[in-house]
């Protein structure tokens, strides 16, 4: 470590002076997107980082290469040297490392509490909402980076232009995705908040009461100082309803006529969206956004609203929009492959809520109108499938061919009537399409060999391990003849 690097670390750590007492930080579930980002930033700040997870992945390998000690499997001995233990939302009190930390009186904090410490003495920009958080966080980061402001960022997904989901910057700016799934975003004390939209999701956290969820978002916005800014999407009916209850400066964005930052003349040309952004007391911006879909135009407008309020130059905004490479697993183009049945385009997308799936379908339809849309869908969680069952059926019947995998349980027990077979039967009974249920992903090559045609757009959709499946298909280059042989 050079003298200059030591001085830089000292300056950064001086932002949180009381954290100097902390030497070693242990992350349970370190391989998750949200956890790994915080771990990487703290590692780069000079803290000793250890962590555990149930399996190796690319994230744990990268952290290990950077100097973290990563344990595969959870054991009480893993926390022996820890000053503090950070847990993800998926970790409960029965975890042996949590139990050992409690017994040793080692502080156990949630992910958002540690993120709040990173944000406490920085200029925090927090991005919340049911959908679009990861992409919006990446777009804000890209603009500030283009402007030479070198922000720290912690995102819930890969920022492709940076090659990572988190990075320690040299400025006081911290841009972070704020997670409402367990209400832990209430720990954050940002200077600027973005709320992209509010829908009924993660309702177990909120006792099944949508009013409680809405009030929690209001409470989140009221964590802003009195001089802070709430950047909200006025197109969302719930947000529009809540605006009179927000006692902070509100800046709106959207397609609506009364938006402070307004999108006009949107059109999609393949992978790119093109539109004009109209701002009060500023020149209009003609945007070329290098990711498709009206929903991404909204995400871009949120980022532009933040940057405009921070007086970032238009050149940086325009360069960030056209230069963005998007985020991992958000309409990610994995390639076009010449198969035994013809040329097929493969796209991978993380969307797992009906609204997210719907906007992905619309982006595919608008950008590639001549293509037949074949979707491999993996429902995520039985509880979400149960709660949004009819919405899923309504959205999924829009594709031309639907292949459905088993529900990715994410630790949940099966719920009768909320499984993939039931959902397939419901969609089939409506008469528009005939879904194909695939119980074992090993059967996918044979199924695809029988259904793919020249010019198809194959969309792998969901938040479980469907992303790995998509990459396996890409590695095979969708070679249907080889698939049939196997």
Curated annotation (Swiss-Prot):
Binding site for ATP: 129-135
Coarse class of the protein's main subcellular location: cytoplasm
Subcellular location: Cytoplasm
EC top class, as a word: ligase
Highest taxon of source: Bacteria
Record keywords: ATP-binding, Cell cycle, Cell division, Cell shape, Cell wall biogenesis/degradation, Cytoplasm, Ligase, Nucleotide-binding, Peptidoglycan synthesis
Pathway stated in the Swiss-Prot or TrEMBL entry: Cell wall biogenesis; peptidoglycan biosynthesis
Stored Pfam families: Mur_ligase (PF01225), Mur_ligase_C (PF02875), Mur_ligase_M (PF08245)
GO CC term, one of those recorded: cytoplasm
Annotated GO MF terms: ATP binding; UDP-N-acetylmuramate-L-alanine ligase activity
Keyword Chaperone carried by entry: no
GO BP term (any one): peptidoglycan biosynthetic process
Stored InterPro entries: Mur-like_cat_sf, Mur_ligase_C, Mur_ligase_C_dom_sf, Mur_ligase_cen, Mur_ligase_N, MurCDEF_pg_biosynth, UDP-N-AcMur_Ala_ligase_MurC
Catalytic activity: UDP-N-acetyl-alpha-D-muramate + L-alanine + ATP = UDP-N-acetyl-alpha-D-muramoyl-L-alanine + ADP + phosphate + H(+)
Keyword Cytoplasm recorded: yes
EC number from the UniProt entry: 6.3.2.8
UniProt record similarity statement: Belongs to the MurCDEF family.
Function field: Cell wall formation.
Name of this protein: UDP-N-acetylmuramate--L-alanine ligase
Species, as recorded: Vibrio vulnificus (strain CMCP6)
